[in-house]
Amino acid sequence: AAMAAEDLDFVVHYGDYIYVSDGGTLTIDDYRGVYRRFKANPYLQELHARYPMVVMWDDGEFVNGIDRTMEPVRFAAARQAWFEFMPVVRPADDPERVHRAFEWGSLVDFTMLDVRSRRDRAIESNDPTTLLPTTDTALPSGAAIFDPDRTCLGPDQKAWLKDRLVTGDFTWRHIGHGYPFVALRLEDYDTPEARADPPEGFHVNGGKFLSTEQWDGYWAERRELIVQASPRRLGP
């Protein structure tokens, strides 16, 4: 009712349109069944009838916590179901690409990013020296968080975004995805005292983070994007 009272041009959805968190949704028919159940909701049907929607997937459309190492057959099934049930036009030159951009004159450059399917494996929040699962080789002193080779976007998508950030003259630039971009520390290890007498393993910007599954687990890449965008004007 509140949305109906607004003069909306479109709705943006950043993912988790469905949420698969079990081990039983495996095939294309399984994923299609989940979408059919969700789309039977009359309120959701009314939303789609009233407004166009700009969408991106998160992990809920696949299985909780996905990354580029997801089992390929299951990933392909989930991806195909998403394309079938969501309002997305597949690009002719690259039918598997989902990151894309929209422009409204010189007012706004509106990008949508895939921060799930191309990313490196997440880091364990409580132990930033190791990768998930914990059987992986430990990295010293939180090095995994600040590893410059770790990527959330993947090389092709990152290059595409960096180019867009310096292309065109827009009043606003919107970068859409399902993660908080700011650092969310539970404990800040980067203090004046630590800088004056660095303990073993000290790292500038170090801390205990709320979730290193998000951008706090891909610190170097986030910094690279901030530096690229710094001369430009970004929206809130």
What are these regions (language model features)?
Residues 1-236:
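Long, structured stretches of catalytic cores involved in phosphate-ester chemistry, encompassing
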